[in-house]
């Protein structure tokens, strides 16, 4: 019986990390995961992992910035790529290391905070459902995190934008550009609970189609109101981080990337698609977009584990 040899560059790099570097399994898998994310990105771009050029690396890092990936995560990903391409050069796969000319991302004095899934659950658990606005706020947080919306997109979301049976919502972003974004079953459930309460609000004429309504003003929530609601809920949850509505968008992108989602799809879901990205994904149907997000979003994994 013959033993199949592992001779791909990624296979040999894994062996190198385990045997020569002596890394723990957890650290080894972290390195491999980072490199595999980049390998998937290069493959989607039609490139060759062994013939990567400096400009491709810069585009990758620029895309990480574009989708709001935490600077520390950016720095870690680059460190992993430096290690991988250093190995490829040492082992004779390539003549020069393309990462040598790349500068590490500068870490600002104050880094944007990202919430863990546990912290997001704590924020939701801190909501008092006995209050009139309780279920609205619960649905609001779930939609922010499930869909990675900007606060302005949340405030402008309309009932006519919801395709809940298909598990999609239509989002109008900057420049009035529209995109379809998958919405999780949990967020859909919270919205349906909220709509039961919303039916009892006498909404001012002209605003009936807006999803999130202020009970007191009987009009759509403003951005400032959402900001204050989030601040209050985070304080009630005992979380000592600087959190705004945008934090949920950062967390959405970071958790998807860490979970292995396709970087270009994350970019498209956030409404940051470039002309090139739009061309690349023009042929991808809604089913793939939905499956990609649902497979890698920790909220959906969390739901599956509790079924």
Give the role of each language-model region:
Residues 1-307:
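Conserved catalytic core of the tyrosine transesterase superfamily
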